[in-house]
From Swiss-Prot:
Reaction catalyzed: Na(+)(in) = Na(+)(out); Ca(2+)(in) = Ca(2+)(out); chloride(in) = chloride(out)
PROSITE patterns: P2X_RECEPTOR
Positions of disulphide bridges: C118-C169, C129-C152, C135-C163, C220-C229, C263-C272
PANTHER family: P2X PURINOCEPTOR, P2X PURINOCEPTOR 5
Polar residues compositional bias, start-end: 412-422
Protein name: P2X purinoceptor 5
Topology Cytoplasmic: residue spans: 1-34, 363-455
Biological-process GO terms, alphabetical: calcium ion transmembrane transport; chloride transport; monoatomic cation transmembrane transport; monoatomic cation transport; osteoclast maturation; positive regulation of calcium ion import across plasma membrane; regulation of skeletal muscle tissue regeneration; response to ATP
Membrane topology type: Multi-pass membrane protein
Keyword entries, A-Z: ATP-binding, Cell membrane, Disulfide bond, Glycoprotein, Ion channel, Ion transport, Ligand-gated ion channel, Membrane, Nucleotide-binding, Receptor, Transmembrane, Transmembrane helix, Transport
Encoding gene, per UniProt annotation: P2rx5
Annotated NCBIfam families: P2X (TIGR00863)
Positions of the UniProt region annotated as Disordered: 384-422
Amino acid sequence: MGQAAWKGFVLSLFDYKTAKFVVAKSKKVGLLYRVLQLIILLYLLIWVFLIKKSYQDIDTSLQSAVVTKVKGVAYTNTTMLGERLWDVADFVIPSQGENVFFVVTNLIVTPNQRQGICAEREGIPDGECSEDDDCHAGESVVAGHGLKTGRCLRVGNSTRGTCEIFAWCPVETKSMPTDPLLKDAESFTIFIKNFIRFPKFNFSKANVLETDNKHFLKTCHFSSTNLYCPIFRLGSIVRWAGADFQDIALKGGVIGIYIEWDCDLDKAASKCNPHYYFNRLDNKHTHSISSGYNFRFARYYRDPNGVEFRDLMKAYGIRFDVIVNGKAGKFSIIPTVINIGSGLALMGAGAFFCDLVLIYLIRKSEFYRDKKFEKVRGQKEDANVEVEANEMEQERPEDEPLERVRQDEQSQELAQSGRKQNSNCQVLLEPARFGLRENAIVNVKQSQILHPVKT
């Protein structure tokens, strides 16, 4: 049994399977197949080719350069600074203009600082003390302003004080104005010039209108109908980013300016236009301890005696990050052929699904399954099968009933009876053959009778 199974397995390795086309008269399966074909065709035409434009070769390696320029002036009149006019050199950092720049909107100024000895500011845990031993000489104050001298300074009869430090004195004040210093910054304008290039297609463009009119950039402002005048009002950018200008100007913040280029180079170059998006990038929760954006800088001077002093400024403002990205597409035969081939493969998957429904799921599935799958043997294999059948016939037991032998003989007689009409010779030979068959039957009877005697 095991040898026969192994032989059958080896022979099955040399079987060849070929497709057989069966026309199934099933309206349900036929309708399902046409619906699947329609869905796949619509997916291929609408989504793949019209929406995703998968027939194009795509270039996402965008090369970009950004130049920014801020213009505007602001006037302030405070008790600490007096009357002062602020221009671009005062409130724009860095002044040369890059894709990241900062506009000052609020200041805390500590003027006339000189290096010397003074008390640390209150509210700094490492600078607080009760006695001199709490202030180790030579140690710096963590998150403070200078080095400890070893003395604890207390006011009046207070038991708590702050360490004496060597620093720029007086130290920076903690108080903050309730209104931004540069309220007029809302009307400042920002000019953003962007150059882009797609190297795969050697395509270049800028976001500024190509014109000979020298006064164009001096009179225009950006709008949805004027995309090639990239001059933005600062207050408008903050509003488009979903923020309030007075709030963000007081404590500062970070705003992203996104320039998106999505170019279809199968169309005219004039159809490749920039799209602008604005978003606030920093933590804008009002109760967060990390909200806002600020940094410090100083301006240094010397008095007539040559002693250096400075004005320390803690600047709050808006940091702008200009982020450019994009892609360009152009027709190419390679992605077109690939996507068409994928669509045809989906068609084949639809046919496979319908085959499963036809031969396994519907009511007459067994009938269709028998019609679809058929085994075909070669002539040599048919001869082998016939030989095996003859061998099995010869191995039939001797005690088989005589009636079955007679039935076989009668069937042979009926098969040969049709040949008697062919010639007279055959008619003459039939009685002799019949006599031989009778003798064979008698011999079989005798063997059956003698068999019990032998045993």
